[in-house]
Amino acid sequence: MNEAVSPGALSTLFTDARTHNGWRETPVSDETLRELYAPIKWGPTSANCSPARIVFIRTVEGKERLHPALSSGNLQKTLTAPVTAIVAWDSEFYERLPLLFPHGDARSWFTSSPQLAEETAFRNSSMQAAYLIVACRALGLDTGPMSGFDRQHVDDAFFAGSTLKSNLLINIGYGDSSKLFARLPRLSFEEACGLL
């Protein structure tokens, strides 16, 4: 049986963590980005399908390609973030299932139903994006996830001719706490949950 993590760990991962819009001028190394992927690949996905593909943009040239896809409210915070991750999903993720889920012909579940394949890829890549956010926090990084961007532009600029489609963007770095908004409320258990 697993042991519960400490209250301090829960605070780091959830209750004290914030969504950042401003960044300190501290770089995030490529080694750190590799460290981020190491734990998130173990996060659960349907039939171990692992559809997320992540592009870490950390160069001026990469940000310039991303720039036209950003909404006005997300522009400055993205251009100043040390890293922006494009979390995409592979529309042909099922081609890896003979390796990732060798317990049956899982590939055929999805080749026979394009709708199921798309729903599965989008849903599970969204979960993997959440794992990335938690991994960032665990390694002392801050994040700013965003869905306010032109997905088609991102797909054309970064994934043309491939099977990848963008899901969301996550700015990653060391946040500038002086630029945080006041903490916003959350729904209570009674408002968000039910017991049957």
Swiss-Prot record:
Keyword Oxidoreductase belongs to the record: yes
Membership in a protein family: Belongs to the nitroreductase family. HadB/RutE subfamily.
Protein name: Probable malonic semialdehyde reductase RutE
Origin species: Shigella sonnei (strain Ss046)
Single GO term (MF): 3-hydroxypropionate dehydrogenase (NADP+) activity
Reactions performed catalytically: 3-hydroxypropanoate + NADP(+) = 3-oxopropanoate + NADPH + H(+)
Expression induction or repression: Up-regulated by the nitrogen regulatory protein C (NtrC also called GlnG) and repressed by RutR.
Cofactor names: FMN
UniProt xrefs under CDD domains: RutE-like
Lineage: Bacteria, Pseudomonadati, Pseudomonadota, Gammaproteobacteria, Enterobacterales
Domain of life: Bacteria
